[in-house]
Structure formats: structure tokens, C-alpha cells
Amino acid sequence: MTNFTFDGAHSSLEFQIKHLMVSKVKGSFDQFDVAVEGDINDFSTLKATATIIPSSINTKNEARDNHLKSGDFFGTDEFDKITFVTKSITESKVVGDLTIKGITNEETFDVEFNGVSKNPMDGSQVTGIIVTGIINREKYGINFNQTLETGGVMLGKDVKFEASAEFSISE
């Protein structure tokens, strides 16, 4: 069994969404945690739970962030966390239940496992994974949008994300 200690200082969770049909808006969730159990040498034994604090959303625009926290989007007064609980993990895919605003759907995302390395600063063993995917926000009741004069919509339905998580590990 491997002991995993999440290193939030060396991890990130970023997203982007199409805006006004012509550009992308990017942001991040600044508070999240990932708990992992299992043997790093046998991916079939790994189980992980990611917990994201939606009120930590950061798009570098306070007014937009406040709107994203409202009931039009994440409803952070009522829904204080987003969770992803794995069902299976391989070196290239992860399948699990994603819950946003109390709505749960099974999702499959891509995984990039970057092996194990020794940290020269303290001698600890570290590992990292990068998880990428696309989430249809409308499946989670995040339906806010406005029609544009050109016939398009203000916001795309698909949200692309990249989560990079680093862990100290020990046996």
C-alpha cells in the first residue's frame, strides 16, 4: 500500500469555456484536495476522491466570479463542494462519478501519469498525474446563457479542464 500526501502548493485545477462564440475565458479553482489510496505499482488498486470548493473560483474578475458563485451557475450558498469519486483508474483513463450542484453523472477523463521522482529539496518521493477532459455543464444544471444577435450563444456548453496533482508518496 502506498501512502499519498496531496501537495496543493504544486497542484492546479484550471478550466476554459467558449465566450461570445469568438474567444475563451479561463479560470481556476484555488481550493481543492485529492485523496488517493492504493498501490502506485498497480493502478487497478487505486481509488481517488477529489473535492473542489466552488466558491474558490477565480477568473481574475471579481464581478464575474460572484456571478459564477450565484444560483445561475454553481449556487455556492447551497452547494459548497464539487466531488469526483473514481470507479476505475488506468495509466491513461479515469472513470468516476462527478457531482456538481447535487447532480451526479459518470464521466471518463484522460490521465497522464508522470512516474515517480525524488525531490532534491527534501529527498521525498513524489508522483504526479494530469487529468484532462470536457464536461457538459448543462448535465449539471448549469444552464445560464444568452442568445447573441448573430444567433450564437454567450457561453459554450462544454467546459475543458486540466487538473495537475502532485503527491508525496511513501510505502
From Swiss-Prot:
PANTHER family: PROTEIN YCEI. Disulfide bonds: none annotated. Gene3D superfamilies: Lipid/polyisoprenoid-binding, YceI-like. Belongs to the UPF0312 family. InterPro entries: Lipid/polyisoprenoid-bd_YceI, TTHA0802/YceI-like_sf. It comes from Staphylococcus aureus (strain MRSA252). This is UPF0312 protein SAR2769.
